[in-house]
Regions:
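A short, structure-level motif marking secondary-structure boundaries and short turns
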Residues: 1-2, 15-16, 57-59
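Short polybasic/polar patches that bind polyanions
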Residues: 21, 35, 68
Length: 74
């Protein structure tokens, strides 16, 4: 796992929790899907500065939509 500062780690944890609630999947399963698809380290972590300014609903919609675009979820 890449080294993440505390703020980014808390943000990633928040994102995983919100997406897991939306998709009715366990947080562990969401983490695996985000990690394995590259969304976690190629999108969420590098885009932290912008993404953390979004509302939780918009952020969750954005991540779920991106997961759908990449075929991670249907």
């Amino acid at each position: 796992m890449n080294m993440l500062n505390k703020d980014i780690l808390q943000f990633v944890t928040f994102c995983i929790g919100r997406v897991s609630q939306r998709l009715n999947l366990s947080p562990n399963k969401v983490y695996q899907k985000l990690r394995d698809s590259g969304i976690l380290y190629d999108y969420i972590v590098p885009s932290y500065d912008v993404l953390h300014t979004f509302s939780s609903r918009y952020l969750t919609d954005d991540i779920v939509d991106y997961m759908k675009e990449k075929g991670v979820v249907s």
